[in-house]
UniProtKB/Swiss-Prot annotation:
Stored InterPro entries: Ribosomal_uS14, Ribosomal_uS14_bac/plastid, Ribosomal_uS14_CS
Lineage: Eukaryota, Rhodophyta, Bangiophyceae, Bangiales, Bangiaceae
Organism: Pyropia yezoensis
Record key words, sorted: Chloroplast, Plastid, Ribonucleoprotein, Ribosomal protein, RNA-binding, rRNA-binding
A molecular function (GO) term: structural constituent of ribosome
HAMAP family documented for this protein: Ribosomal_uS14_1
Superkingdom, taxonomy of origin: Eukaryota
Cysteine disulfide partners in this protein: none
Annotated GO biological process: translation
Subunit and partners: Part of the 30S ribosomal subunit.
Protein's recorded name: Small ribosomal subunit protein uS14c
Family affiliation: Belongs to the universal ribosomal protein uS14 family.
Compartments (UniProt record): Plastid, Chloroplast
Gene3D superfamilies on file: 1.10.287.1480
Pfam families: Ribosomal_S14 (PF00253)
Length: 100
């Protein structure tokens, strides 16, 4: 189980990313249309003034059950440990153990 403060930090980052999403998108669009170098530098400075954690890239995928960040299966939102346990208990529909 991940530390509670790490999970809370990720929640805070996702909220900030949602809050500043449209503002970041507008700055990116303006950067594409900007012609002069000084305009681009001004727009980049505007993006740097936003909080660092408001960038969606800084978020990390975590298991919704344990909060583990490594060994994460994107399709299920689970870490590999929980995925294995739940699949053995037949709690994940359509998941079967392979045999060949």
């Amino acid at each position: 189980m991940a530390k509670k403060n790490m999970i809370q930090r990720e929640i805070k980052r996702s909220k900030l990313a949602k809050k500043y999403y449209l503002k970041r998108l507008a700055i990116k669009d303006q950067l594409k249309e900007a012609g002069s170098f000084s305009d681009k530098m001004d727009l980049r400075q505007n993006s740097k003034e936003m909080p660092r954690n408001s960038a969606a890239v800084r978020g990390r995928n975590r298991c919704w059950l344990t909060g583990r960040s490594r060994g994460y299966y994107r399709d299920f939102g689970l870490s590999r440990h929980v995925f294995r346990e739940m699949s053995h208990e037949c709690l994940l529909p359509g998941v079967t153990k392979s045999s060949w």
